[in-house]
Amino acid sequence: MNWQDGLAYAHAVCKGDINVCKAVQLTCQRFINQIENKEWEWQFDPDYPQHILDFAAALCHTKGPDAGKPIVLEPFQIFFICAIYGFRAKKDTSKRMVTDVILFIPRKAGKSTLTAIIALYELLCGEKGAEVFTLATNREQATIVFDAAKGFIENMPQELSGLFAVSKYEVKKIGDTQSMFKALSRDTKKTGDGKNPSCVIIDEAAQITDRNSIEVLHSGMVARANPLRIYITTASFTKETKFYEDMNLYKSMLNGEAADNPRWFGLLYGLDPQDDWRDIEIWKKAN
């Protein structure tokens, strides 16, 4: 897997070669504009996304007909990683530009696999004393990404799996006693109070009506040099949530209705308002 596949995806979307909604088109054009901008404080360094892609290539699928086969990410997933990890501060390339991320996409699109890779990478290669958490409304949902990550470790070659210490409810990085990767949920009353997260993956974020559980974890990230918060979700009938508030803000940035904040990145797959949902060809926009 190569970072250039992510760049190619963005260009293909902007050329109209891939049928996606307006929000994804605008995101891809924004990404290209950011790469071409030589006048601001950030620069695109492909070595950083390539590093996590190389890590992903060492992992194998753990379920279904592809079990045991190496992970091969889709172009949109490679683009997702490029956008998150590629932009670095010119004065200090260890500092990542993107800190807040949204992946809004239908089910069975590989978002749990993708974010499990990111979670393990952040635990292994992120800040010393990394604290990585998944958050959801219930324990079952919160453990989906966590269990996927544990499955990757169980199927790693020894030289890689030996870098992790795995227990039922926690994964640690060997040699870093302050590191941890855990699943949190509201129903078990295990939330982010007192935590100092470096990476948080909020699963089915659109379903979380208790905004405090999100805000507590977010406020705990302020001391981190490279915090990363990722919303992954499908749509929800409940719109009065912290997630929809943040997604609407990001949409406003894309549409030029709000000042652009480069610390935010999002891929929002879906249909456009004028689309006829009965047209099967249109479904490709959301999948």
Predicted segments — roles?
Residues M1-N287:
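Phosphate/NTP-binding elements of NTP-utilizing enzymes
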